Curated annotation (Swiss-Prot):
This is S-adenosylmethionine decarboxylase proenzyme. The active site is at S112, H117, C140. GO terms for cellular component: cytosol. Its EC number is 4.1.1.50. GO terms for molecular function: adenosylmethionine decarboxylase activity. HAMAP family: AdoMetDC_2. Catalyzes the decarboxylation of S-adenosylmethionine to S-adenosylmethioninamine (dcAdoMet), the propylamine donor required for the synthesis of the polyamines spermine and spermidine from the diamine putrescine. Is synthesized initially as an inactive proenzyme. Formation of the active enzyme involves a self-maturation process in which the active site pyruvoyl group is generated from an internal serine residue via an autocatalytic post-translational modification. Two non-identical subunits are generated from the proenzyme in this reaction, and the pyruvate is formed at the N-terminus of the alpha chain, which is derived from the carboxyl end of the proenzyme. Heterooctamer of four alpha and four beta chains arranged as a tetramer of alpha/beta heterodimers. It catalyses: S-adenosyl-L-methionine + H(+) = S-adenosyl 3-(methylsulfanyl)propylamine + CO2.
Length: 264
């Protein structure tokens, strides 16, 4: 897409939001409590602040304010307001390709924010535990928040991720013509690295005429040892391993497709 010559500031708002899920099996009530405690410490407000601050540093954004909070009995939230320095729009790469990992990258944001909220949960029946992190990166300017997608998913390795990207509003060029998007995009998948795509099943639901893009991903490979908390597969009988595997797989399928499946 040819770069636009704008009249004034780029008024398009670009928002990327995604839910990251981690699934676990904890057999006893003590194990479930232990998982919640572990995940709450692993993703507390301080750790999340470090991740989001590194995101800002990686893309060259200036942090204006940080608000963070840990909650009782569990969960945390962090919101960072950021702004940009003057930048030449001609130097900004808006092509459709995977975003960077933490390397030498320059980008700028204005009137923008990055926020994350965490939701650990478990149920007393069945032994299933889930951890959900909701992340939103919203920018107003020439930069797409999709550039941060690749890094954030690498930082928060998870079983299932649902992503939504939307461009809102319009901006005018020097001739007064309104533009409702300023970069080419066919799929969020095109902003993900090859190694990440190799790990996940992927599905798109896009509404191109509304500039709304939705992608779901779920890990391809299932290894039971990665889903047991405070236990090993060798500690379980073959029947127990199969029952737990079926339970976890059903849970992941339901979250991925967003609907409850019948009990077989």
């Amino acid at each position: 897409m040819q770069k636009l010559k704008l009249h004034g500031f780029n008024n398009l708002t670009k928002s990327l939001s995604f839910c990251i899920y981690d699934i676990c099996y904890a057999k006893t009530a003590d194990d479930r409590d232990g998982y919640i405690t572990y995940i709450d410490e692993q993703y507390n407000a301080n750790r999340l602040t470090e991740i989001l601050s590194e995101t800002c540093s990686m893309i060259g954004a200036n942090i204006l304010n940080i608000a963070r909070q840990d909650y009782e009995p569990q969960g945390a939230s962090v919101t960072i307001l950021v702004s940009e320095e003057p930048v030449d729009p001609g130097s900004i790469d808006t092509s459709e390709h995977p975003g960077p990992l933490p390397e030498s990258v320059v980008a700028h944001l204005d009137k923008s924010h990055i926020c994350v909220h965490t939701y650990p949960e478990s149920h007393p029946e069945g032994g299933l535990c889930t951890f959900r992190a909701d992340i939103e990166v919203s920018t107003c300017g020439v930069i797409s928040p999709l550039k941060a997608l690749n890094y954030l998913i690498h930082q928060l390795e998870s079983d299932i991720v649902t992503m939504d990207y939307r461009v809102r509003g319009f901006t005018r060029d020097i001739n007064g013509v309104k533009h409702y998007i300023d970069h080419e995009i066919n799929s969020i998948q095109n902003f993900m690295s090859k190694d990440m795509k190799a790990l996940y099943h992927m599905m798109d639901v896009n509404v191109y005429q509304e500039n709304i893009f939705h992608t779901k991903i779920m890990l391809k490979d299932f290894d039971l040892k990665h889903y047991l908390f405070n236990a090993r597969p060798d500690d379980l009988s073959a029947e127990e391993r199969k029952a737990i595997t079926d339970l976890l797989y059903k849970e992941m399928q339901e979250i991925y497709y967003g609907r409850n499946l019948p009990v077989l």
